């Protein structure tokens, strides 16, 4: 059977450099020392962290990760119209209305204004909050992201950018068969206290399986289109072909409850049927009136469906709120409910932990259950205005909660994942060891199938089958090689360790500190 380019190749971790890699604590110490000597210099810090292997980006929305310039280019190719008055992109060619200009004929000033409209660039001139600017951007580029062939082009942009930052794996949020599933859900009779089991069975009896098959065909088509665009089977594949990709099926939390339930049920069924879909998530503003009204109901929906399909992984946006954006009462329980009621394996953002009724206990529970916090520093600053000392990142670390850094919507925020590592290091004074742990955590808490390479990830202690091997070695022992072949996650973790060995052996980190003798430096 032909292997999908978007699935992890089990042997990828073993086809590395032919050079023998040896454990070298001295290399690690030397690299850490170079980092400490230069981390107060932003250009050098960026160069270091751009080169540093970063296992995965686990919290990324496909459409929001694409840069605005790409959308404008694709709009021009499709002869779409830009309304320069409303600053929107139309899903068709221009008519005779005021301010309508073909995307292919936009002047530099109009194009710059559209980039600002589709991103957080020049937010101080937008005349609106970061929250509104951010979430409204999706409606502007929506007509372009839906064009034929563009999902593959979007994925190509993301995977190639990831490869350029030494990222090995992406878990991307997308919506498959969204409209059809919502229409099916709209036929559900909904009551104040719904019988979730009965309604789940109704969905199964009325076409959910057929929509799952349609969704799998959509993924097949995307897979094929992406592979062709990237030349993944050619002699000169694009760099992104080496990045493994998995999908998280989205549910829009602002829809009516019957549609949300149908989308959630569909996400569970799709994840069971297709190994490319490794879990689910809820998206759209958590502060939306419907999302607030139905929050606990939605957690109960997920909890019920998870009991029917416990093998499906759950990542949830929870606690992406701040005092003033919503009344205090809505800050009291969202993270705890996501962990306890819904059974989330990862929590995205988790910003309002300080306002939770049982914040200390919730962090202890996350540590106990191994529920990772997906920290999106730039996004939290832009949308919520939470930054620096106000952000709970140091508190999660102090509480022993597993933490990963993520980009969220790098196109809208005008960043990349390396930027988030730079921001974490420069804002919180983190050392190389902690940043390396973030990188390892991103694969440890990924939803890739299989057991972990680590018996104890925090202590970098490998499983018994590989205990006599150097993690990342090009030729693992037979027992270790068999272990790696049996676990996609362990195979990717092995590849990350090999990348760290190469990174830490760079002669750059052996050189003296780069210090200018110039005045004031």
Label for each model-derived stretch:
Residues 7-17:
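Bacterial N-terminal signal peptides
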Residues 1-5:
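Positively charged n-region of N-terminal signal peptides that target proteins for export
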């Amino acid at each position: 059977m032909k292997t999908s380019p978007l699935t992890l190749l089990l042997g990828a971790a073993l086809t590395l450099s032919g050079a023998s890699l040896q454990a070298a604590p001295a290399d690690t110490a030397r690299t850490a020392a170079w980092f400490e000597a230069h981390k107060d210099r932003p250009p050098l810090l960026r160069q270091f962290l751009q080169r540093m292997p970063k296992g995965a980006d686990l919290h990324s929305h496909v459409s929001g990760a694409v840069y605005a310039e790409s959308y404008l280019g694709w709009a021009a190719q499709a002869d779409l119209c830009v309304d320069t008055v409303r600053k929107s992109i139309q899903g068709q060619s221009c008519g005779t209305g005021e301010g309508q200009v073909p995307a292919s004929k936009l002047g530099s000033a109009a194009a710059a204004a559209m980039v600002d409209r589709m991103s957080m660039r020049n937010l101080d001139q937008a005349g609106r909050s970061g929250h509104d600017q951010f979430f409204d951007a999706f409606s502007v580029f929506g007509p372009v992201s839906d064009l034929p062939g563009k999902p593959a082009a979007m994925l190509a942009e993301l995977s190639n950018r990831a490869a350029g930052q030494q990222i090995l794996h992406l878990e991307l949020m997308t919506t498959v068969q969204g409209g059809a599933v919502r229409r099916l859900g709209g036929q559900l009779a909904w009551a104040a206290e719904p019988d979730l089991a009965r309604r789940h069975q109704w969905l199964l009896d009325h076409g959910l399986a057929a929509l799952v098959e349609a969704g799998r065909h959509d993924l097949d088509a995307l897979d094929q289109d992406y592979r062709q665009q990237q030349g993944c089977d050619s002699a000169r594949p694009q760099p992104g072909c080496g990045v493994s990709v998995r999908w998280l099926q989205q549910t829009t939390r602002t829809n009516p409850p019957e549609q949300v339930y149908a989308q959630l049920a569909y996400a569970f069924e799709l994840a069971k049927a297709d190994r490319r879909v490794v879990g689910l998530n809820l998206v759209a503003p958590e502060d939306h009136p419907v999302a607030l009204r139905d929050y606990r109901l939605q957690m109960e929906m997920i909890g019920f469906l998870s009991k029917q399909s416990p093998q499906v992984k759950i990542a949830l946006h929870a606690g992406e709120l701040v005092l003033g954006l919503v009344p205090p009462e809505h800050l009291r329980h969202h993270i705890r409910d996501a962990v306890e009621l819904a059974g989330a394996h990862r929590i995205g953002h988790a910003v309002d932990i300080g306002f939770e009724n049982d914040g200390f206990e919730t962090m202890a529970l996350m540590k106990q259950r191994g529920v990772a916090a997906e920290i999106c520093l730039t996004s939290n600053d832009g949308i919520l205005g939470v930054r620096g000392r106000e952000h709970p990142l140091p508190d999660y670390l102090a509480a022993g909660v597993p933490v990963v850094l993520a980009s969220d919507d790098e196109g809208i925020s005008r960043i990349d994942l390396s930027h988030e590592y730079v921001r974490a290091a420069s804002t919180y004074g983190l050392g190389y060891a902690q940043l390396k742990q973030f990188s390892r955590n991103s694969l440890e808490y990924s939803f890739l199938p299989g057991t972990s390479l680590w018996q104890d990830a925090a202590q970098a202690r490998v499983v018994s089958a590989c205990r006599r091997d150097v993690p990342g070695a090009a030729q693992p022992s037979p027992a270790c090689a068999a272990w790696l072949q049996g676990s996609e996650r362990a195979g990717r973790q092995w590849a990350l360790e090999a990348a760290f060995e190469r990174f830490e052996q760079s002669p750059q980190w052996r050189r003296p500190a780069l210090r200018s003798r110039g005045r004031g430096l």
